[in-house]
Structures are given as C-alpha cells and as structure tokens.
Amino acid sequence: MALAPTSSAISGSLRSSMLKLLMRLKSRTLATRLRLYEIIIEMQELGITRNEREIFYMDVNVFRTQSVVRRLVSSIASELQISKHDLGVRNTLKGIFIGRLGFVRHHGLGMVEMSSKGGCPQLIPDMSDIAEVLCDYKKTVVVEKDTVLQRIASEIEREKCLEEILFVCGKGYPCKNTVLLLKMIEHKTAVAGLFDLDPFGIHIFCIYKYGSKETPDIRVETIMRIGVCMEDVLEKNAYKDVFVKLNVHDLKMINRLVRFGELSADLLFLRKIDGKVEMEALFSKEPRRLRYFLFRMLERISS
C-alpha cells in the first residue's frame, strides 16, 4: 500500500507547478489556479482542512463560482495523483436526514448516535470520517427538496407509521457526502426517491443512481424512483393546472436523458405535453393531497 504523501511533498509539488504556470501567459484561469495553489499550500503548512465552499468564500472575486473551485480541486488532485482528502479539502456538508442513525468512526474512535427531534432535520456528518453507518430502517426515502421534506416532517406527527422511515434530503443536486451516506446503507435498507416530474428532477435522480461526472463511482445503485411519475398527474385530468411550460434548458435535458430506458416514458410524456410538475405545486392545494400522494408513492417501495 502506497504511503500517504506528506504535507511538505504536496506543498513542494504545488510550488513547482506554480513556477511553471508563471512562465505562461497571464489569464483569468491562470490567476484562479494560482490563488487556489496559494490557499492549499497554506492549508498544508498549517495542517488545516477546508471544504470547497469555504475555499470559494476566501476569494469570491477570483473564483467567481463554487463550481470553478470544485473543478480545479479535482484537476489538481488528478495531476498530483492524490485524493482531495490528501489536499486537505473536506466534503461540503449540506445533506440532512430525519430519523436516527449511528455513525462508527474510523480507527476505533467510537460511535456517535444522531437523531432528529421535533421534526428538525440533522445535518449529515462528514462521511470521510465514518467507517460504518448503523441503520435499523427497512425503508429510506430520498426527498429532492428540503421544502418538501419540511412538509413531510409535519405529517410525521400525525402519521406515526412515517416514523418507521428514514428520510434523507440532498437539497437539490446532492453533495458527495449525501450520496456516500446512502451508498453505505443501501444494502441494509430499501432506498427510494421523490423528485419533481421535470427534466432536472429526473436528472437529480440520475446523479444519485448513476453518479456524477466528478464522482462516477459514488452512486446508489439500488435507489428506485417512486414519484412524481406520469401516472400521478394523469388521474382523471385532475391535476392539469399544476403544469408549467418547458423551457429550452428543459428540452436539452430531456434529449440528454432519454437514453435511460427506465426514464424515457416520463421524459417523452413531458415533451409531448410541453409541461413539467414540481412537487410543491402538486401537494400545495389541500393538506390531504400531500398525505394521499405520499402514501401512494410509498406503496411502490419494494420491501
């Protein structure tokens, strides 16, 4: 097993790369990369870690967007043939859950039990520090949006059977940390997901199931999509008022995703009707509507 690189070795490699870059023509990309080198060298020398969001806010004017930081960090790690963890870059934490889980730390550092109370979600801890997740739930439901998770949380008080389900939310496109949690428990629990019936909601499902470009190996292969589906909005034409017209970005995303056979029917349906449905619109009119759809969709989970 190869030895982990030392901080001084990483700093030395980055300084060498900086000198090479300085010999090239100046550009915004060059300035951005040099600023990131400077930050990572400082982190290595001080023995501190940061996540990509923290790095981004250290120099917003240079980095412009958080995705620039993410791409450059991945590029640097690839060039040096080391992991982001070796660079001192932690996972960005944004995923949350409602339920109770035990997190066993690496290197025998003990176990921490975390549970949500009063319907208040818990932040998923940094999974790079976790060796195992203790999960007693037979069913886990991934919810695309935290606004919908909040609605579900209010139903848990009324419907005690929902306490038997672990709810996880990646707040839109999931961070690596959220997917890592699900990957660690997918063989202990049936994992299902609730997503908008729109091209980008379906794309978010694909990120969970098939991985992203940056992390293709981090995926939840067993996750099933239980809603919102075409049949949910076709009932006696009762919900035709919830559709929003597709835009050019939606149409481009449909063309990208139709190659996934299991998703093509819903995608072609959206293109045919030139519309999409967000969960908030589908559930918002009556309190009973959320309860009705939620239990209907939960019945689709394979036990």
Curated annotation (Swiss-Prot):
Record-listed E.C. numbers: 5.6.2.2
InterPro entries: Spo11/TopoVI_A, Spo11/TopoVI_A_N, Spo11/TopoVI_A_sf, TOPRIM_Topo6A/Spo11, WH-like_DNA-bd_sf
GO CC field: nuclear chromosome
Annotated Topo IIA-type catalytic domain residues: 1-96
Catalytic residues (positions): Y57 (o-(5'-phospho-dna)-tyrosine intermediate)
Annotated catalysed reactions: ATP-dependent breakage, passage and rejoining of double-stranded DNA
Entry keyword set: DNA-binding, Isomerase, Magnesium, Meiosis, Metal-binding, Nucleus, Sporulation, Topoisomerase
One Pfam family linked to the record: TOP6A-Spo11_Toprim
UniProt binding sites for Mg(2+): E144, D196
Family to which the UniProt record says this protein belongs: Belongs to the TOP6A family.
Function of the molecule: Required for meiotic recombination. Mediates DNA cleavage that forms the double-strand breaks (DSB) that initiate meiotic recombination.
Protein name, per record: Probable meiosis-specific protein SPO11 homolog
